């Protein structure tokens, strides 16, 4: 498949469907390993940040299959098993987003795959392993969720801030973010519908796209955490920026994603936190 063809809508759609199958296969591997998983096989990358052989096995599988689909693309991956140099397009892969959830048998956790060219996100696929939901989008094509034979378009919710369900995640860099999360909870607790923390950036974004959450904010995260989900939110009618309010968020470490209606309120809060 030639690079220039990727900008044709049908080519993007067809490639997205193929990436969904890759994500499902990786998800099936993760699901099967969970039944015999032992915490003794967990490694600590940093404080409160873990990796298992399952993360690495999933990444190896995904990288191999994506190379077959698009040999000319490079990779940005969480576990660093594949790299990039001067390729025009890059796969951005989180082989298991929500590793801590996985270790504890606590849903959700997911496979996240995006394709980018420069600062443009062309494809986003997130497969939630427990519920077997595949969320996906391609640039200009809308966003969808598929479970079994059932496929539905995604649309963000319509709640205003007083009724909104917010997701305020806790990143691994807890010392740096502790004063921020305290201020955010103080600002919103009792002033919104409710607040959740779900342990997966990719799934928080997909839940915003599906209208299950109205907003999500997190800092000190990697591109692999948010890239696929960000496109899904935008294609579902939502808004995504960094903590500074810039729409150019793809090289940063912060994300604010909302239904649009509550964006300015949440953005003001994170700026002042």
How would you label these PLM feature ranges?
Residues 85-144:
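DPxDG-like acidic metal-binding loop motif
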Residues 143-146, 166:
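Hydrophobic/proline-rich hinge and linker segments of small-molecule sensing/allosteric domains
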Residues 2-96, 247, 261, 268-271:
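N-terminal subdomain of lithium-sensitive/metallo-dependent phosphomonoesterases centered on the IMPase/IPPase/PAP
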Residues 30, 55, 66, 99, ...:
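Residue-level signal for inorganic ion chemistry
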Residues 61, 110, 228-231:
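Short amphipathic alpha-helical face segments that pack within enzyme cores
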Residues 71, 87-88, 119-122, 162-163, ...:
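Short coil/turn connectors at secondary-structure junctions
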Residues 154-273:
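An extended, acidic
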